[in-house]
């Protein structure tokens, strides 16, 4: 039996509980949160009786194997290092840390510990994406020349997600003082991870960040100063070029990821408009000698989720992806985007 503790009992933690609880041989034995009301509600909802208000107390008194770090972003580093020092495997929500230096510290600590470490880049769960990555990595598309990727949401311009000026789950994401790195740190880390995993590392980037003024200056203690959209031109280490962008004001696009990778022997694309559950296909063309350029849609059976990969890694001792190294690389790109936008120039990564 693999025993887990969940640290942080906000809304995302429900998905962690449900996913891990559905895996045979896994038990959530304790939960921890400084917010007593959140802790009580989460424990009542999921039937977890053992609760802690302090991570120190959890590590000192509870017998378990691994943690799910679902705390706010600014606590990811501290909790992650604390868990590794206590000999616990770590499954961390993204981003791995608030900057690349902190992320590297976590990578080194994980390597020195020999413990299993993973970052929950949710959309790696999409089987269509995994199929696409396998095709690209196999070399079937030849030399990769072009990569274009977007991640668009509409919650600043529609009420599909709710009313962003009335709910704290939206408000903090718009305020740097509340720990937000804007859309770049929220969904940008996802799309950078998705673009680089099949193709390889980005060599240099030119990025422009935008704060939209139409939403107002802020609400109460929340000042709306975090970036709402960004556009980036990129060059990969392998010579490929492309564009990557994200927006929270993309009216009509609920939660839409679109990735297109083009080589000299073919092209491949994935697109899903909800969560990873509808990303079960990819489209591919190898018809380079025809004027029609026929695209074929390929269904991919469900691949293991990050949650399942984490548990399998603990059981086998072999660390699957996406690990802390992937999380650090994504954060390195995010840091470069901030620098590029501020200095209005290309930045080497």
Where are these regions (language model features)?
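N-terminal Rossmann-like dinucleotide-binding module
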Residues: 1-46
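C-terminal helix-rich "cap/oligomerization" subdomain common to oxidoreductases
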Residues: 1, 6, 26, 66-69, ...
